[in-house]
A protein has these predicted regions:
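Bacterial N-terminal signal peptides that target proteins for export
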Residues: 1-6
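Aromatic-patch recognition
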Residues: 16, 24, 30-32, 104, ...
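N-terminal secretory signal peptides
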Residues: 20-60
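Compact alpha-helical subdomains of small soluble proteins
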Residues: 44-116
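Bacterial N-terminal signal peptides
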Residues: 7-16
Length: 116
């Protein structure tokens, strides 16, 4: 393969690799916050520990990886609601209920601000 072909491949593939790494970094950050939280998470009217909920989201992400091209996709397609019932995921943190989607959006925005 000529140098020109290598250069072309490099120029076309690097942004995709970089984007995929950024998505993985941001999603891993969100999952880490869940894992390190003292929150309880409700899905389909059942309460789960932070570890159980994090494992659920990781499993759901792995099963649907091809649908996720951004952290926003992860939030909307994986971490927002039950794929079975359509019910939103809810977090109980420090006595306050919050919708997981809203919590994750706030966390993501804060994470991006602190990294730029």
């Amino acid at each position: 393969m000529s140098r020109l072909n290598y250069a072309f491949l490099l120029v076309t593939l690097l942004p995709q690799i970089s984007d995929a790494a950024a998505v993985e970094d941001e999603v891993s950050y969100l999952l880490g916050v869940v894992d390190n939280s003292d929150c309880r998470f409700v899905r389909n009217d059942i309460s789960y520990s932070n570890e159980e909920f994090q494992q659920h989201l990781m499993s759901k992400w792995q099963q649907n990886e091809e649908l996720i091209s951004s952290a926003e996709d992860f939030i909307e397609k994986i971490a927002t609601r039950s794929s079975i019932s359509g019910s939103p995921y809810v977090a109980l943190c420090g006595g306050e209920l919050q919708i997981v989607k809203d919590w994750f959006i706030g966390l993501l925005e804060s994470h991006r601000r602190s990294n730029h």
